[in-house]
């Protein structure tokens, strides 16, 4: 029904008319950087992921004291970035580049293609309509 109405699938859980994609979320799914300001907010910059204190009063008290309101952080290593690029990239209609897959992931992609869950595109892979319904399982296979 959405396709018939002129909408296109551009992300596992999102459809839009041409040009109407949510640029904010595309930044996340494409591995971009973002600021997180406020209680419970998350941020990502140059491979460093951090998150703020969740409780609004505790966050405000830290800010009032001139303290960093971060509750924690982690540096995303190369393997983590690779896995995230698979997980987030497969959510998108543009799919993933084949070079993010290791040998086991490449074999899993060929198997998923034979199962009708992935389709090859020049230099990479895209979920089929059936694959979108099984996206988490496909990602787990491709992680190797």
PLM features: residue spans?
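C-terminal scaffold of the Radical SAM
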Residues: 1-102
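Flexible, acidic glycine-rich loops studded with aromatic residues
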Residues: 104-106
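Short, hydrophobic-biased segments on the C-terminal half of alpha helices
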Residues: 109-110
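A short, conserved structural fragment
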Residues: 113-123
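Minor-groove-contacting beta-hairpin "wing" of winged helix-turn-helix DNA-binding domains
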Residues: 124-128
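Short, amphipathic alpha-helical interaction segments positioned at domain boundaries
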Residues: 130-144
């Amino acid at each position: 029904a959405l396709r018939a109405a002129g909408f296109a699938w551009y992300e596992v859980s999102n459809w839009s008319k041409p040009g109407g994609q949510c640029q904010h979320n595309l930044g996340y799914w494409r591995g971009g950087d973002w600021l997180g300001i406020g209680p419970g907010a998350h941020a990502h910059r140059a491979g460093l992921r951090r998150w703020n204190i969740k409780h609004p009063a505790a966050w405000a008290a830290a800010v009032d004291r001139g303290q960093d309101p971060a509750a924690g952080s982690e540096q995303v290593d190369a393997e983590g970035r690779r896995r995230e690029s698979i997980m987030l990239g497969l959510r998108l209609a543009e799919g993933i580049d084949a070079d993010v897959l290791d040998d086991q992931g490449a074999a899993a992609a060929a198997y998923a293609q034979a199962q009708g869950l992935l389709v090859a595109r020049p230099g990479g892979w895209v979920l089929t309509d059936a694959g979108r319904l099984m996206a988490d399982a496909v990602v787990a296979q491709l992680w190797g």
